[in-house]
């Protein structure tokens, strides 16, 4: 009991020191790693880009922090990844949200501007944010693009959240679409590519195999290989008794692969096809 009271008193002292001197726990000797969660202030800390930049894990650094979508995390326990020489060291001391999706780890790419990311990319970025929230200590917020000087969300953050919501809806739509048109299996060689269908292709278990077809995305020239049910009524009319027993083959978004037998469950494609 006395030990618990002593810890509570120490934590309270740390909070008072922070409020008087405006210092984070990691800057108070002996406290930063003793009670990191117990002593964490509910409102969090507001940091500028300049303040965050000194938490890069380098010589004389105060620790290892990074930010994603304006939220700051202490990633010290992952120092082998985020510290100097680590595979993710370029994320330390900054908000490089865009680079998580683009893979551009140059100075130009390690930025927090996410306005050009697609809804699905933003959804994946949000998954990264959730990962840090679940695995690392939240320090506070980074003022600038996503939070103002008072810690309130900016229009940029509101816009980002709207795009994430669109991404979530697209993901749900894609999951439903995949049930009707599961992705093909595929493998590559130096000269060709093989696509084929099975009762578990695309990770979608079903009682039919189907045949490979190109499925185009509305309004674009892009397509993906899907497996199409080639018997019974179309999916849009499952109870129809008046059909030509072609399943979903007549869907207008589908096209046959050239030089492939349309009845086969597999197809060899030249690279670039």
Curated annotation (Swiss-Prot):
GO cellular component, one term: extracellular region
The keyword Chaperone is annotated on this UniProt entry: no
Gene3D superfamilies: Cytochrome b5-like heme/steroid binding domain (3.10.120.10)
InterPro entries: Cyt_B5-like_heme/steroid-bd (IPR001199), Cyt_B5-like_heme/steroid_sf (IPR036400), MAPR/NEUFC/NENF-like (IPR050577)
GO biological process: nervous system development
Signal peptide: 1-22
Cellular localization per UniProt: Secreted
Family named by the database record: Belongs to the cytochrome b5 family. MAPR subfamily.
PANTHER family linked: MEMBRANE-ASSOCIATED PROGESTERONE RECEPTOR COMPONENT-RELATED (PTHR10281), NEUFERRICIN (PTHR10281:SF4)
Comment text on domains: The cytochrome b5 heme-binding domain was proven to bind heme, although it lacks the conserved iron-binding His residues at position 82 and 124.
Protein name: Neuferricin
């Amino acid at each position: 009991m006395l030990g618990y009271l002593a810890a509570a008193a120490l934590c309270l002292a740390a909070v008072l020191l922070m409020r008087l001197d405006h210092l984070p726990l990691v800057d108070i000797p002996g406290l930063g790693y003793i009670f990191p969660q117990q002593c964490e202030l509910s409102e969090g800390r507001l940091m500028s880009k300049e303040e965050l930049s000194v938490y890069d894990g380098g010589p004389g650094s105060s620790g290892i922090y990074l930010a994603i979508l304006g939220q700051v995390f202490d990633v010290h326990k992952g120092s082998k990844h985020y510290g100097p020489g680590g595979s993710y060291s370029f994320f330390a001391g900054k908000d490089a949200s865009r680079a998580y999706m683009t893979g551009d780890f140059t100075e130009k790419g390690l930025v927090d501007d996410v306005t050009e990311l697609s809804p699905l990319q933003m959804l994946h970025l949000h998954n990264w944010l959730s990962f840090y929230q679940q695995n690392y200590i939240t320090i506070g917020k980074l003022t600038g693009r996503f939070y103002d000087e008072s810690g309130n969300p900016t229009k940029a953050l509101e816009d980002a959240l709207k795009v994430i919501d669109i991404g979530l809806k697209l993901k749900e739509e894609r999951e439903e679409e995949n049930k009707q048109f599961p992705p093909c299996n595929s493998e590559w060689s130096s000269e060709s590519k093989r696509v084929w269908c099975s009762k578990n292709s695309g990770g979608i278990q079903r009682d039919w195999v189907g045949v490979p077809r190109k499925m185009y995305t509305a309004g674009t020239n892009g397509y993906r290989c899907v497996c199409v049910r080639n018997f019974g009524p179309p999916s849009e009319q499952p109870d129809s008794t008046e059909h030509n027993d072609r399943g979903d083959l007549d869907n207008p978004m589908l096209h046959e692969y050239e030089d492939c037998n349309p009845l086969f469950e597999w197809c060899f494609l030249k690279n670039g096809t």
